[in-house]
Swiss-Prot record:
A Pfam cross-reference name: Oxidored_q4
EC main group: translocase
Tree of life domain: Eukaryota
Protein name: NADH-ubiquinone oxidoreductase chain 3
Key words of the record: Electron transport, Membrane, Mitochondrion, Mitochondrion inner membrane, NAD, Respiratory chain, Translocase, Transmembrane, Transmembrane helix, Transport, Ubiquinone
Family, similarity comment: Belongs to the complex I subunit 3 family.
Keyword Mitochondrion: yes
Recorded GO CC terms: mitochondrial inner membrane; NADH dehydrogenase complex
Signal peptide feature range: none
Assembly information from the UniProt record: Core subunit of respiratory chain NADH dehydrogenase (Complex I) which is composed of 45 different subunits. Interacts with TMEM186. Interacts with TMEM242.
Organism of provenance: Ochrotomys nuttalli
Subcellular location, record wording: Mitochondrion inner membrane
GO biological process terms on file: mitochondrial electron transport, NADH to ubiquinone
Length: 115
């Protein structure tokens, strides 16, 4: 009962906040807010330079494998618990998913910087 109440309250509160954010847009938009700020000077060139999509993909891959380390780091302490039958299969499933993701990234040549 408490779980359903928490889910219902969170859902209703989220819907109210989304509705308020949608129906009350910011009305004082003017061009100075849309321009980049460079120490009080007018920008010499465009501040919105395009970036390399390859760099973006490598950065996302790095973040995913950094998250892997954060998830696998507590495993030596978790092995000492009496619930080892739950810890090891979960860790192996996580490692398998990440290894398959790495293999897919490698086969798609996402890790090669030069082409």
């Amino acid at each position: 009962m408490n779980m359903l109440l928490v889910i219902a309250v969170n859902t209703i509160l989220s819907l109210i906040l989304i509705t308020v954010a949608f129906w009350l847009p910011q009305l004082n938009i003017y061009t100075e807010k849309a321009n980049p700020y460079e120490c009080g000077f007018d920008p010499m060139s465009s501040a919105r330079l395009p970036f390399s999509m390859k760099f973006f993909l490598v950065a996302i891959t790095f973040l995913l494998f950094d998250l892997e380390i954060a998830l696998l780091l507590p495993i030596p302490w978790a092995i000492q618990t009496p619930h080892i039958n739950m810890v090891l299969p979960t860790a192996l499933i996580l490692l398998t998913i990440l290894a398959l993701g790495l293999a897919y990234e490698w086969l798609q040549k996402g890790l090669e910087w030069t082409e």
